[in-house]
Amino acid sequence: MAFPNTSAQQAETNRKILEEIQTKKQLLAGGIINLGLSNTNQMPAPQLLGQPTTTTATPDLVSTNSTPPRAAFNPTSSTTLGFFIPQDSYFGNSLIPVLPRLELPATPSTTTPPITPIANANNPK
C-alpha cells in the first residue's frame, strides 16, 4: 500500500509545480513580476530642500510616471537633426538636447578674395 501512496504524493507535487509554473507564466505575460528586484534593495532618492516629501512608489507607478516624458521623447527625437538623452531630473528637464555643429558651406558671396599688396604711390619700389 505504500507504493500507491507515494505515486499519489508525487502526482500531487507535480500538479502543484505545474500550477505554480502556470501562474508565473501568467504574471510574466502581464508584466507583474519585478524580475528579482525588490523594493528593499533600492535606495531612496535624496530629497532636495523645498521639495515636498513623497512616499516611495511601486514599480507600476514609476513606469506610468515616466510615460509623458517618454511620449514627448519619441516624436521629438525623430523630427530633429540632433538627438536627446533621457535623464531623471528633479527640475523637470528630463531630456538633454545634443545638437550637432553644422559647418556653413563656402559660397562665393561670403568668401573674401585674397588680399594682395598694393604699391604705395608715394613710396615706389
From Swiss-Prot:
Protein family: Belongs to the SOSS-C family.
GO cellular component, one term: SOSS complex
Annotated source species: Drosophila willistoni
Pfam families linked: SOSSC
Coiled-coil region: none
Record GO biological process: DNA repair
InterPro entries associated with the record: SOSSC
This protein's name: SOSS complex subunit C homolog B
Higher taxonomy: Eukaryota, Metazoa, Ecdysozoa, Arthropoda, Hexapoda
UniProt xrefs under PANTHER family: SOSS COMPLEX SUBUNIT C
Residue numbers spanned by region Disordered: 44-73, 105-125
